């Protein structure tokens, strides 16, 4: 949902009401918002917003944020059920939405994994190979800006498969 940011895309009320009507009873909210949910203060702010507006149960999966023991413990104590890691760079002009979420080199990804392991929680990946995405960016100009075909042209399935193999190896 990315709430409370971007209400034009949907709000906690609108999206959880729709979920409830469809029989969904629980939502796991990811960290992307503005700012990214990567520290206890932002976790608390979003939790308060959800408590005041939801129709269903919810839990949060924050970003790791700063790789300090204090930040990790504060997120765990706040109620994190898992952590989310992106293996690609944030989109241009959206860095604050991804702050503490993106780790793009094997060294940084491994460091993030070792840090997350201290929490004894699951770590979830958005796994794509940044180098492969960079090499396919050239195909972006073949399509109009909002053409859905640009996604497949610039984000080949091999970029995800390659990244997943790399994460398993780590």
Question: What do these predicted ranges mean?
Answer:
Residues 22, 56, 78-81:
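Structured loop/turn residues at beta-strand edges in well-structured enzyme cores
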Residues 1-10, 56-68, 98-102, 153-158:
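Active-site mouth loops of central-metabolism enzymes
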Residues 1, 27-29, 58-62, 81-85, ...:
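Hydrophobic faces of well-ordered beta-strands that scaffold small-molecule active sites
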Residues 1-53:
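Metal-associated gating/positioning segment near the N- to mid-region
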Residues 8-16, 66-75, 166:
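Short, acidic/polar
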Residues 24, 55-57, 120:
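A generic structural signal for alpha->beta connector loops
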Residues 70-85, 89-170:
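Histidine/acidic residue-rich metal-binding segments in metalloenzymes
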Residues 9-10, 41, 66, 107, ...:
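Residue-level recognition of alpha-helix initiation/capping sites
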